[in-house]
Amino acid sequence: MYNVLLVSLLGEFDATGEIPFMFKRAGCTVDVFCSADSWLRSNKYHDRWFETSEIHSDFKNKLLKHVEENPDYYQWIVLLDDAAIKLMNESIQSEYLFKKILPITKIENRAILSSKIGLSVICEKYSIATPQFINYSEENNLQTISQKLHFPILLKENFSFSGIGIQYCADSFLLQDCLNKVTNKTNLVLQEFIEGEDIGVEALFRDGELITYNCAEILAYMHNKFSFTTRRRYYQSDEIASLLKILGKQVGLNGFASIQYVYHKGRNIYYLLEVDARTNMWMPYSRFTGHDFSEGIKKIIGGDFYNINEPASLHEVEISIFDRDLRRCIKYGDFKGILQWMLNYKGYWRFIRLYDFKIFYRTGKKMLKDLLKKIF
């Protein structure tokens, strides 16, 4: 049996809830390492639960102890949230433990893990197309910044996710006001904003080799274009696949990655914006795309690490995350969207989590709580 340990530090991070199901479909024995109220436990698809707290020192020490006491039991350890990746990346010095626990094989590229400035530096190192950026410091006055960057720009706090910690600044005259709103300026990234087509990508790598992937046109955001998404149209792309193969080998990606590109049609350039070396909420829904991550996991179990060489499929499918999208519809009065859910638009009912009562129940509680907030 192929044994995996799924690890989450952030109990309220709901994107972990369906990940055990994805591994179970691949035939794995699934252990989870998380707090008592974690979404990672809110399913029936894990075999054992190892309890920890969300206190960083306790979490780190318990995880390292668990791994060291079971050195050969787990074939794969998967960190599922940015906070866990950041904590363990900062804590581990041993190259053996680094490769055992963290999702890249090249320890020299560890800066990319849960770090906005780290990603920008890695892009510069390997000549990967990314928007022009600078690492902000108090020594950079407004005139210097305006000379180095073309506005509009984004202000990105170094450790941030789901759109939190990102600001849009349209003009240099507004920059100081934007800077005043930043809560943590350490390694703050100022980056040119590229107007183009946003492309969400999920990918699975093994030892730098691309195993499987999906890319998507973004159809709906929860709040603004820097927040998480609720509707996507999935497809395959030879251009994206080629970029992913290069990225995986250069960085040494070894696991899942949630990636964002923006395509500038006039320049014919795909700019890399985000690489979060972890799973996301969309990956379990790959079973509806024809490019299933559970099948990718099976390939890894079978030792099939060969690159994807077949031409991209022309098949497209629209997918929506039930609770997130319905919450968006209610929050912003999107009655058309609500009606689409009621009428099973494009087979949307497939995406309701009826296969698992535990996660369906917790999802329902969260939706009801949000609805009551909206009413009262």
Model-derived features: positions:
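Phosphate-binding site of ATP-dependent enzymes
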Residues: 170-249, 262-271
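ATP-binding N-terminal substructure of ATP-dependent carboxylate-amine bond-forming enzymes
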Residues: 1-105, 372
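Active-site nucleotide/adenylate-binding loops and adjacent lid/helix of ATP-dependent enzymes
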Residues: 110-195, 206-209, 238-242
